[in-house]
Amino acid sequence: MKLLLLLIITAITVPSFADSPFACNRAALTPQARKRHFDELSPALRARKKNIRELCNGFEFEFPPDTATFDLVSEWVEGERLCCPFFDIDVHVEREGGSLWLRLTGREGVKQFIKADFASWKL
């Protein structure tokens, strides 16, 4: 009974948060991290991009599965999750040396944001 009461109290008192706006918060990154993210990592990933899949709620980007690209994707995701917290970000590596996939999805409106903000990725 005490556990049930605790669960009910927890559910009632847990604050709900509003969704963040569809805007890149560049201030979430330090000046050095911002330069690295936008001026180095993003262009490097665009150059390595093999394919793009359009999804109903976002996009998937295919990359070669080499270690250097995996490291770039990982570092890019670390920055992107801070400046664009409204993204659902998934990294998937196919078995047997298959492709590396970066998936950006989210709530309604995210796909349109990606189309506008990632125009240089040639969606």
Stretches found by the model and what they are:
Residues W76-V77, F86-H92:
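Amphipathic, hydrophobic secondary-structure cores in small proteins
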